[in-house]
Amino acid sequence: MAQADIALIGLAVMGQNLILNMNDHGFVVCAFNRTVSKVDDFLANEAKGTKVVGAQSLKDMVSKLKKPRRVILLVKAGQAVDDFIEKLVPLLDTGDIIIDGGNSEYRDTTRRCRDLKAKGILFVGSGVSGGEEGARYGPSLMPGGNKEAWPHIKAIFQAIAAKVGTGEPCCDWVGDEGAGHFVKMVHNGIEYGDMQLICEAYHLMKDVLGMRHEEMAQAFEEWNKTELDSFLIEITANILKYRDTDGKELLPKIRDSAGQKGTGKWTAISALEYGMPVTLIGEAVFARCLSSLKEERVQASQKLKGPKVVQLEGSKKSFLEDIRKALYASKIISYAQGFMLLRQAATEFGWTLNYGGIALMWRGGCIIRSVFLGKIKDAFERNPELQNLLLDDFFKSAVDNCQDSWRRVISTGVQAGIPMPCFTTALSFYDGYRHEMLPANLIQAQRDYFGAHTYELLTKPGEFIHTNWTGHGGSVSSSSYNA
């Protein structure tokens, strides 16, 4: 007899925790795993005493579901998702729903959405953020795909999502086809940026200010009471305080080679594809790439010279406040760039995205959760057509208030030989964005000189002109040479 409200396939820790979360909110969940013994183990241990039911096969699982059947896939992105979909489709009926909760590439989600729509199956690709803890007690959920599915999953999704403010769920419908997974991808890219910015602040504290771990931990704890209040600042303070079994700080013992799963890279690639200068996330990805060259860096450190020791001007306390302001200003730039990419993607794919709603989805439950996101939500509520966060009065004023500190930090860091790829690219973007005239006119002249690519005059927009710069060429308007 059909009794389960929803099924979940994939009993790794995330899957188990999401099932227990749904159970806590009164939903009956059917659990399935490719290795069936894992279902029995889960029911006998973590799910003991709950209403969770198990299935011994996909057919058994489908038979236990109320209609329309709702199935969440929480398996490795890629071929595994397609394999399960292929096995599920013959067992499902028109109007049934498959939900992919993994970190799938948004184009795959769009393809699956279209393929399944032709077969009468409703497909949803949902970003799920917050890690194992979030899955258990309230993640940020970013569903997109076939909107006909939303009324049938909304109650479950919004019940289990993190809550902020007066109980607003960090979950709402994002948009058509791959929109949900695109938004999750950008979220992950911003996460890369936030983490790298914090690392650069830590590097400056350690090597310019010579702060001890307990001093740095205290600084981050204080910062967490300001506009930087966020999950990542909070855990950074905890990491700096943490001591190993020998009583010494653990952090200095950790190999300085950062891993990555690829979603930051996807964001940077998408930015290039859609012509958006999402420079900070790109630099955050490259910083991890550089960190992975550990052996080369060890050799280079013995051969390549840097600047002499720089004497810090002013007090350590005032420079620490400068670092805080530089971090805040750079963070604003990162989010401004992320939302630029979302806006461009919406134009490319015809999505109707609620940018304030997206900020709310990220406000709780996820890795980038912060008070700061509430300010972004407010900005888009004031002006839903806001072209760039930097043009909102609140953020314009915030950056202006931080600007002198930001420039001092970068100047001091450069003179001290501290790598600050994200601090510096953030300021470069800000300066570029606020310039009415950039030297790109010279690039256009160069392109026309060697490739006859033409240019426009400021006084004649829309009219493309080629100049015979040497007197030897013809007056062709373009050539096969591109740059």
Swiss-Prot record:
Q: Which residues carry this modification: Phosphoserine?
A: S57, S129
Q: Which reaction does it catalyse?
A: 6-phospho-D-gluconate + NADP(+) = D-ribulose 5-phosphate + CO2 + NADPH
- Leading EC class: oxidoreductase
Where does it primarily localize? cytoplasm
Localization, UniProt:
Cytoplasm
Task: Write down the PROSITE patterns for this protein, in alphabetical order.
Answer: 6PGD
Q: Name one GO biological process term.
A: D-gluconate metabolic process
Its annotated pathway reads: Carbohydrate degradation; pentose phosphate pathway; D-ribulose 5-phosphate from D-glucose 6-phosphate (oxidative stage): step 3/3
A Gene Ontology cellular-component term: cytosol
EC numbers on record: 1.1.1.44
Which residues of the sequence carry a binding annotation for substrate? N103, S129, G130, G131, H187, N188, Y192, K261, R288, R447, H453
Q: Name one Pfam family in it.
A: NAD_binding_2
GO MF entry, a single one: NADP binding
Which residues in this protein are found as N6-acetyllysine? K38, K59
Active site annotated at which positions? K184, E191
Q: Which UniProt keywords apply?
A: Acetylation, Cytoplasm, Gluconate utilization, NADP, Oxidoreductase, Pentose shunt, Phosphoprotein
The record ties this protein, via PANTHER family, to:
6-PHOSPHOGLUCONATE DEHYDROGENASE
Subunit comment: Homodimer.
Family, according to the entry, reads as follows: Belongs to the 6-phosphogluconate dehydrogenase family.
| Function as written in the Swiss-Prot or TrEMBL entry | Catalyzes the oxidative decarboxylation of 6-phosphogluconate to ribulose 5-phosphate and CO(2), with concomitant reduction of NADP to NADPH.
Q: What is this protein called?
A: 6-phosphogluconate dehydrogenase, decarboxylating
State the organism named in the record.
Answer: Mus musculus (Mouse)
